[in-house]
Regions:
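Extracellular glycan-modifying ectodomains
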Residues: 1-198
Length: 198
């Protein structure tokens, strides 16, 4: 990320905060993003693993404790700043698969192979996302943001799965498909139930 991208990122964040502030404070804000990729790099592209996609005062290609602390502090500060205006819900990271799920399933089908059971273990998931979880938990403690956890809807038997009933729930390796995102409807209903009760 060069200085131009850094400037564009700050401008985009400023624009988003301004737009959000135009809405009634009764309307909750739900934050869903790939938070871990910005701190830790890509999860399955070898040449982009362990290279942060974001930086603060100076560009660094190493993941250091200092960088992770600064990144976490930024996440907490941003969430708490937004929570001054309205209820804020932060979504825990969506599990990232190591392969393009629909492509792998289609390839297996083309060659008459059994449906591949694409998944990652909960241990792998938590190892990848522990920094983000800790920052999210700190934001809950500091300013009362709420957490939306997709794991009960996407993971079972100690694993997070790339498909359900023979259908991919991702449209690549880390973005949920239309079919997959419908699995999270009960999770998001919490937001609307809480909003309706106020």
């Amino acid at each position: 990320m060069d200085d131009n991208n850094k400037t564009q990122c700050k401008e985009c964040n400023g624009w988003a905060k301004e737009k959000i502030s135009e809405y009634s404070e009764d309307i909750p804000l739900v934050i869903v993003n790939r938070t871990s990729v910005y701190a830790l790099g890509q999860h399955n592209i070898k040449e982009k693993m362990n290279i942060p996609l974001s930086y603060f005062n100076s560009y660094n290609i190493e993941i250091t404790d200092g960088f992770l602390n600064e990144y976490s502090a930024g996440l907490i500060e941003s969430a708490c700043e937004l929570a001054k205006q309205r209820p804020v819900y932060i979504t825990r990271p969506i599990p990232e698969m190591m392969v393009d799920v629909p492509n792998a399933m289609a390839r297996a089908m083309m060659f008459g192979k059994p449906d591949p059971q694409i998944s990652i273990s909960l241990e792998e998931y938590h190892a990848r996302h522990k920094v983000v979880w800790a920052a999210q938990d700190a934001a809950v403690a500091r300013c009362g943001v709420k957490i939306l956890d997709p794991l009960p809807y996407l993971c079972h038997d100690g694993r997070c799965w790339g498909s359900k009933d023979g259908r991919p729930i991702y449209y690549d390796d880390d973005h949920l498909s239309e079919y997959g995102n419908k699995l999270l409807v009960p999770m998001f209903k919490q937001v609307f139930a809480a909003s309706a009760s106020h």
